């Protein structure tokens, strides 16, 4: 994957600031999450040379911040017991500082809930979005606006599913 980040030089002219792979990734053994860019709610200084994605990968953005990321969901092999899936999911969420987001995993081990509005596009694959009381099958280029609900993603295909997401920290009112 190639990531191109633009900015300005000290004359105010537009330039390419970064051109290369994502600075950080995690969990390639179970799919993978690749940080493309983050904001922290502060002013954007487009002349700096700081790679905003080159920091520890945490699921949710900070107050006023955003996360722009690419993630991959691998198919689940047949016959994996639920207790093993619960353990794998718990470990994966702990690695991204999100164990506390797993509020109710009875329906699926990867169920989680964040205080974010997420814009997600399925690029490749056959994925089901699981909610507490609903499920919807997604095809490439389907778009989900995920408004702080308890949810999980399941790959129904034989090869990795590829998704892109923007997460925005938000107060969610029910």
Regions found by a protein language model. Give the residues of each.
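Ligand-binding loop in jelly-roll beta-barrel domains
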Residues: 65-66, 74, 128, 135, ...
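Residue-level marker of beta-strand positions
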Residues: 142-143
């Amino acid at each position: 994957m190639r990531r191109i980040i633009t900015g300005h030089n000290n004359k105010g002219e537009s330039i390419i600031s970064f051109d290369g792979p994502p600075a950080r990734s995690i969990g390639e053994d179970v799919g993978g999450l690749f940080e493309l860019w983050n904001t922290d709610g502060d002013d954007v200084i487009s002349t700096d040379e700081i790679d905003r994605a080159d920091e520890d990968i945490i699921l949710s953005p900070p107050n006023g911040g955003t996360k722009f990321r690419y993630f991959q969901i691998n198919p689940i092999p047949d016959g994996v017991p639920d207790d093993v899936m619960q353990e794998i999911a718990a470990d994966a969420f702990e690695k991204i500082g999100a164990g506390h987001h797993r509020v109710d995993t009875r329906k699926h081990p990867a169920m989680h809930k964040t205080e974010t509005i997420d814009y997600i596009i399925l690029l490749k694959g056959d994925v089901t979005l699981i909610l507490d009381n609903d499920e919807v099958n997604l095809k490439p280029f389907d778009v989900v606006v995920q408004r702080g609900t308890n949810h999980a993603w399941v790959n129904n295909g034989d090869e990795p599913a590829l998704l892109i997401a923007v997460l925005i920290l938000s107060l969610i009112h029910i």
